[in-house]
From Swiss-Prot:
The keyword Nuclease does not apply. Residues 1-30, 747-766 are annotated as: Disordered. Belongs to the NAD-dependent DNA ligase family. LigA subfamily. GO terms for cellular component: cytosol. NAD(+) binds at residues 57-61, 106-107, 141, 164, 201, 317, 341. The active site is at 143 (n6-amp-lysine intermediate). Zn(2+) binds at residues 435, 438, 454, 460. Its EC number is 6.5.1.2. The keyword tRNA-binding does not apply. HAMAP family: DNA_ligase_A. Its cofactor is Mg(2+); Mn(2+). This is DNA ligase. Residues 669-758 form the BRCT domain.
Amino acid sequence: MSTVNAKGAKPATDANGQSLNPEEPSEALREEYAQLSDRVREARAAYYVHDQPVISDAEYDQLYRSLEEFEALHPELKANDSPTQEVGGEVGAAFSPVKHLEKMYSLEDVFSTDELVAWLERAQKQVAELPGAPEVAWLSEVKIDGLAVNLLYRDGVLVRAATRGDGTTGEDITHNVATIKTIPQRLSGENLPEEVEVRGEVFISSKDFRTLNEAMVEEGRAPFANPRNAAAGSLRQKDPQVTARRPLSMFVHGIGYVRGVDLETQSEAYEILRGWGLPVSPYSRVLSTVAEVLEFIAEFGDKRHALLHEIDGIVVKVDDRRTQFRLGYTSRVPRWAVAYKYPPEEVNTTLVDILVNVGRTGRVTPFGLMDPVRVAGSTVEMATLHNQDMVRAKGVLIGDTVVLRKAGDVIPEIVGPVVALRDGSEREFVMPAECPSCGTPLRPAKEGDVDIRCPNAETCPSQLKERVNHAAGRGAFDIEALGEEAARALTQPVPLDAPDGTELSVPPLRNEAGLFDLTPEDLRDVMVWRDARRTVTDEETGEKVQRVTPELVPYFWTKPTKARPSVPSKTTEQMFAQLEQAKDTELWRVLVALSIRHVGPTAARSLATSLRSMDAIRQADPETLAGTDGVGPVIAQAVQEFFAEPWRRRVVEQWAAAGVRMEEEVDESTPRTLEGVTVVVTGSLEGYSRDSAKEAILKRGGKASGSVSKKTHFLVAGDNAGTKLDKAESLGVPVLDEAGFEQLLAQGPEAFGDRADAADQPAAGE
């Protein structure tokens, strides 16, 4: 899909040149829009909530722009809860939610100097139209690639710290932030405000990141992919002592809510923040002209890797705070600030080989193995090639010199070959005919699919490893001690030779059904290869030198010594304790852990809340499943296909037999006032975020729908309600304000008498 430029969207056509903008959108168009929205939401959640990006920044930017273009072409489909109207990600389940006193917005991104100049000139024009506004001065600063954090000080004392979350509600990380040495627990200086929110970015410096990763490797643990992931993962640790051991820093770059002090400009605010003892970035400057802003961007683009920390762009803000206030905000971004993103960096390297990886759903993905090369601040030696068609489209051969781009400073991408450097030794990549993990013939899931899959979902070791790793993930059973390496050891142990010459290669897990039946004794003989450092004598020089050699060691048990026998390691003990705790987890997490295709946390929550037990979900007909809020026919079909397979049913049955809870717990403390009642919430409410309003409805037995129809019983309308309010009024759906919503939650529809009865009557003309 083509991107939108500053002048507007291009008209969309299909492959035959037919218009994709009919007066009434088709069902296929609605489905396409829903899928595109879901892809953006999933990518955003992976980045902001789980700190595990699934696509590159550049891919996300393209995906996001495609959604913006779609909505520009089809405004009648645009939903109030579209990702284009939201800030950041959802609030994770691991920490308590806290509401910001003032909303934390995202920034509008531009990706070229032409786009930036257009934005600056447009902003200058808007300021010039404001009576009495001063000449525009631009505060320009580097955009730190870290995690946005909001600090709340009352009477100079730090009382709370939170992530940005969805912009309105974040995660309470106060105890973890308290371990960061550069953040003062108490402000210093004079004229301290009664209450102030200080916004900033938590990061790990480039030097500290290298040291941290060296230590991780030394301990036999996987290194972090980049400083941003390291910072975000460190800050979201459940144990603050772990956070305290990580080299986290912070620079503050703004103020949210403030009471008790007046600030005229952003640059003055920075000086005051510095005077209070807060860390302020040294990389900022107040500039007078657009030309100076462009020079600033070029300057820091040249020295970006020589800075204290990684950056992914430059932020430009109107310096005058009163002008900021008068320009205001959209629903997602301020009109007085913009983020310029540096172009992705490119280098040349050799494509040594193309291998394939088998994922959780059986998808076989080729990836390039390259000579290690440094790009965008990190060393890269692998990059995905997505599928065989993509390999052909890029025109790369094994042995080529290729252009490698670190797209968006996160995920590396092979752009294409440098054909002029070919010497005839290069060879084509051929997709294997059989699964490299289990030997099963590969095939598309259905005719016309680009992706090739291994159909042996039940016993393919690679798929099983990925499913076990997924089941243990933060969004499922949340078993921290069972990571990717442990999942591999459980499903793909190193084969051992028995005395009779046969191989002992039976894994502890043949499929995930036995996950909760494992015992420490089952894992005694599981071995893995580890690098061991040994001091040896160099044969040529006779000197003592350090050598690294592979060594076969137990993974789940300690290595035996003369003085001490082998016993389960502390991590193994933690894993079994966490497995036991996971048996009592919420039903929606169990659904996510099952790796049902298309069923992520959102759909799983809806199914669990609506149907309340695994048996009910398993026995539900397609119409019931599809009618569940946030599910639809595609997910409904995937759920039915899952339970149609006997081995998948055995997984559920064996987990249940092991004690995993398969029913939704009923909260007796909350009255079920909304049983059978469908409520739509639109616009902004003072006392509720979108998620908390939905949760309040679901907890009382109601259905929280995203769209208004003749089946809607009540519409709750806040500020900026939009088209849903118009539709509700045309259908005769009762409309409530926030006070009415709270009355509905407390007393149910009976509190509204005739208005509630009217909602069940068909609208005129039906």
